[in-house]
A protein has these predicted regions:
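Inter-lobe coupling/hinge segments of SF2-like helicase ATPases
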Residues: 198-204, 208-212, 220-654, 658, ...
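Nucleotide-binding motor/catalytic cores of P-loop/tubulin-like NTPases across gene-expression machines
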Residues: 671, 689-693, 718
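Short beta-strand/turn "edge" motifs
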Residues: 680-691, 737
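A short, contiguous, amphipathic alpha-helix enriched in charged residues
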Residues: 5, 17, 651-666
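Short beta-strand elements
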Residues: 512, 668-684, 725-733
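Accessory, non-ATPase domains that flank or precede helicase/AAA+ motor cores in DNA-metabolism machines
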Residues: 1-360, 367, 372-388, 420, ...
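Small-residue-enriched segments and motifs
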Residues: 3-8, 20, 48, 393, ...
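Generic solvent-exposed, charged/amphipathic alpha-helical segments
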Residues: 86-89, 499, 503, 583, ...
Length: 739
């Protein structure tokens, strides 16, 4: 039999596999797809994933290098996840090596063993008693023994200090055979016979009907869109479905859009379940992430909660996938492997033959279209849980009204009345910083970023101008860089300015700012929300971080300071995003006994979109928007791919895209492909960003299959084009941002 040739995927942008000979002493029978091998690659070493073992190679046998080492006895990637990665690589036209690497925790990419660490666990020894005379006069030992007795499954060595357990006391107890030490693998917890740690909440008729419909599809793949108004109890539906999944001996994967939602989601699940819960997102360290990943793979985590990358967490016994806030743009990866976690979760659920639930108060138009056409089951929750009422909307026309740091007089009055009534107020302004720009009142100079076609935002607290696009920062100048005068004025309002002004207007009440700047410290978000949950009258000022899934029962007024930004945009999705944001922010009001009110400041109070959204609701808006998309031939009635390019010199990116466009036109004619339109190339909406000039070419197709047939052949040509070496380019399949 000829020597085995290993075909490996390496973490490289090159869309090809690499052939190697087997490592010395490794037999063909030991090799299986999904295993990791360390291989030489140029002057360095890399970790590759075995895709197949074959007898043939286009490279002469004497030119093939041997792999250096086989790192696994069994593939760390289960076959089902390996299959998902193959599909992902093909659909998103991305390197298989990069895709497989992305699916692995960082430590596995670096060659660490795919095994959970062994840890020492301390527990009370069989037959030990608090009445043992040997500890009668040893209060610290008695206290340590009593603490251990409260943890019948043992306490991990690393948690001793957290429980105030003295190692010296434990060593003395060990010498007396009153405690024991067991070395075993670390896991998130131990399985319980009774899943519920607290009783479930009673369901209303709509919630009950939704649970029953989803439960009827538990034995195979079914997709459901749970479209429930804010505060309708979608989370309670999730929890009861998960309990039924656990009772069937299976695992549940729950995706959330933001890291900041992780702690409160975890707390809610821990309060409800006696279950082993793994948290997977970029905020946990590499070791914790590996442990959670392995626990899920080996069936030792019952519930996996995480952001978009948690989609690639393996499950030994998959039973249910839930995508919360499925409309959220955070589920789309914008760099490297540009996958959409929601769309890929549907593929995974189909491959695993399990149900998937997409939940949102403001479903994406794509998901609504799939529900209306029967691809998903549509489940509506139209009433708020617990008898809470929907908030009332008021459009406040601020034309010709004076604005004090962006806040009108009637808005100030409404805020004051709410605080005086002992309630909380949420002030929404989707703009960080003190002011969007700095203006010279003498010559008209404005603070622009030297690396981007964008204004520098004033951050007064730190005395800085910052670009929110490339991160460039500089001190606020004392004199105008253009004319030398000193009359420099912040123009417009951001959350920092609103916070400052509200503190002056309402000095007797706390003003809490919730944005990326104020929550950058570890646990800052938890501390802010702990203050809010005390229920004392206060003002929350924040960006869209406040709109995502948070429960503020004492908020009865939501003040939206500027609703006009999304009404005029070159991006066809802008109105959808604006509608979702307004409804989600409004949904924070009146979630308990007190009714809520939403006041929207606008210069366009008669705009048809605002009227429809505030008077008829999100679904009326969505149906109108779908009709407009159908007429314009836009998603979900068409399929898009976006080729982006950027270069240091003007014109280089567009020159590359011009050549790429010509190649695409030639392929269309050669393969007789129809229904595909090439739009561009054109400069990007922000042409210069981080010192690079950017351009893009949009492909719009009536059907998905011809588009992907074109993309596969086209990319091979793009990789060989000499002009492509002078630019940085990427292909985005199903783009959500045309930036």
């Amino acid at each position: 039999m000829p020597d085995a040739i290993l075909r490996l995927a390496l973490p490289s942008p090159l869309r090809r596999l690499f052939d190697y000979r087997a490592p010395a002493g490794v037999l063909r029978a030991q090799l299986h797809p999904g295993m990791r091998l360390r291989v030489p690659f140029g002057r360095r070493e890399m970790i590759g994933i075995l895709v197949e073992v074959t007898d043939h190679s286009e490279v002469p046998a004497d030119k093939l290098k041997p792999a250096l080492a086989l790192l696994d006895a069994t593939p760390p990637l289960p076959a089902s996840l390996f299959k998902l990665c193959l599909w992902t690589s093909q659909y998103y036209q991305h390197s298989l090596g990069d895709t497989l690497s992305w699916a692995l925790p960082v430590l596995l990419r670096q060659g660490e063993p795919a095994e959970a660490r062994q840890e020492r666990f301390w527990s009370v020894a069989p037959g030990a008693s608090m009445d043992d005379p040997r500890i009668a006069r040893a209060p610290r030992q008695r206290e340590a023994l009593a603490t251990l007795a409260q943890h019948p499954h043992g306490v991990a060595h690393q948690l001793l200090s957290k429980l105030m357990l003295s190692k010296d006391s434990l060593d003395l107890l060990l010498a007396k055979d009153l405690v024991q030490v067991e070395v075993r693998r670390h896991a998130p917890g131990l399985r319980h016979e009774h899943w519920l740690a607290q009783p479930e909440l009673p369901l209303n008729a709509e919630q009950r009907a939704a649970c029953e419909a989803i439960r009827a599809g538990f034995d195979s793949y079914h997709a459901f869109l749970l479209a429930g108004v804010t505060g309708s109890g979608k989370t309670e539906v999730y929890l009861q479905l998960i309990r039924q999944t656990l009772e069937a001996g299976k695992q549940a994967l729950v995706l959330i859009p933001e890291i900041n939602l992780g702690p409160q989601t975890l707390a809610r699940f821990e309060q409800r379940f006696n279950a082993r819960i793994a948290l997977v997102h970029s905020g946990v360290n590499d070791r914790e992430r590996l442990e959670a990943w392995l626990a899920a793979r080996d069936g030792e985590a019952d519930i996996i909660i995480g952001t978009r990358s948690a989609l690639f967490t393996p499950m030994k016994n998959p039973g249910l996938i839930i995508i919360d806030e499925e409309h959220d743009g955070s589920y789309k990866q914008q760099e490297g492997l540009r996958y959409h976690a929601r769309d890929l979760a549907l593929v995974r659920a189909r491959q695993e033959n399990i149900p998937i639930v997409l939940g949102s108060a403001t479903p994406s138009l794509e998901s609504l279209h799939n529900a209306y056409t029967g691809r998903y089951g549509l489940l509506r929750l139209n009433e708020r849980a617990g008898g809470a009422k929907q908030p009332r909307f008021l459009r406040l026309d601020v034309k010709s009204r004076p604005l004090d740091s962006g806040i009108s007089g009637p808005m100030q009055q409404a805020i004051g009345q709410t605080l005086a009534a002992g309630q909380q107020v949420l002030v929404f302004l989707n703009r960080r910083g003190f002011a969007p720009t700095l203006l010279c009142h003498d010559c008209g100079w404005m603070s622009g970023c030297e690396r981007c076609d964008a204004r520098m935002t004033v951050h007064q607290r730190h005395g800085e101008l910052r670009c929110h696009h490339c991160g460039h920062a500089e001190r606020v100048p004392r004199h105008c860089p253009q004319c030398g005068k000193v009359d420099l004025r912040p123009v417009g309002a951001g959350t920092e300015r609103a916070e400052e002004r509200l503190g002056i207007l309402f000095p007797d009440y706390p003003v809490l700012r919730v944005d990326r700047d104020s929550t950058s410290r570890k646990d800052a978000m938890n501390q802010l929300f702990a203050t809010i949950q005390k229920g004392q009258p206060c003002i929350l000022v924040g960006t869209q971080m406040l709109a995502k899934g948070h429960h503020f029962p004492r908020v009865t007024l939501v003040s939206i300071l500027d609703a006009d930004g999304g009404l005029f945009s070159g991006d066809f999705r802008a109105s959808e995003r604006m509608a979702q944001l307004i409804v989600q922010v409004a949904g924070r009001a009146g979630r308990a006994e007190e009714p809520g009110k939403v006041i929207i400041q606008t210069h366009l109070a008669d705009h048809p979109l605002l009227i429809q959204l505030t008077e008829q609701g999100y679904f009326a808006f969505a149906e109108q928007a779908l009709s407009e998309r159908r007429g314009a031939g836009l998603p979900p009635f068409a399929h898009l791919a976006l080729l982006r390019a950027e270069a240091h010199k003007p014109g280089q990116a567009e020159a590359f895209l011009d050549e790429a466009c010509s190649e695409a036109e030639r392929l269309l004619a050669q393969q007789n492909l129809t229904g595909i339109e090439l739009l561009g190339p054109v400069p990007a909406p922000m042409e210069r960003r981080a010192g690079r000039y950017r351009a893009q070419l949009l492909l719009q197709a009536n059907a998905r299959a011809p588009l992907h047939r074109l993309l596969s052949a086209w990319l091979l040509l793009l990789e060989q084009m000499p002009s492509g070496r002078a630019v940085r380019w990427s292909l985005d399949v199903d783009p959500v941002d045309l930036y």
